[in-house]
Amino acid sequence: NIIVDDQYVILEGQHRYEAIKDLGLPLTYTIINPEDSESFIISMNTNTKNWKNDEYLNFYAKKEKTKNPLNYHDMPYHNFKRARYYKIHFMTLIELIYSSRQKEHTIGFGKGKLFIQDKALFKENVNFLVTAMKQHKACEHRNTQLALCKYLIDKNFDKETFLEKLKKFPDKLVPSSTMDQATLNIKTL
């Protein structure tokens, strides 16, 4: 069954539609109210298997693009998606946005309530993490990224000095199995 809106735009089942069309089989579809489409699609998909954070991300990024075709690139889920493209971990980005990893933030993310209060600072911190990751493989590690978030919150943390020290003493920073160890590694650097 294909899900369409009142304008017959396919909301769910694009691949099924293509396969049915190619096979010449009869097509069945359900028309739903556009206002209900978001909750209906999420509910339908979570009943078959639980959605992962990146599936919510793609869903809401697509919704932002549809609702704001001229400026969707500056919308919260698109900024988040751009950072995910660079392999920054999901919880690291939640920490950068909210200075916290509380469950309520991830629940809100899945409900379409992502809000980035300071987009410029978020982008600056993402760019810093991308630079650090390019400079040292340990910065790709989740615990290192989360530990760096704690430092990024500190106004006295000098990003340039950190990157210079990382270049000079790369052996001091190693992947860590705990965030405490990652924090200590960064501190000793």
Describe the residue ranges of each PLM region:
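Accessory terminal alpha-helical modules
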Residues: 1-189
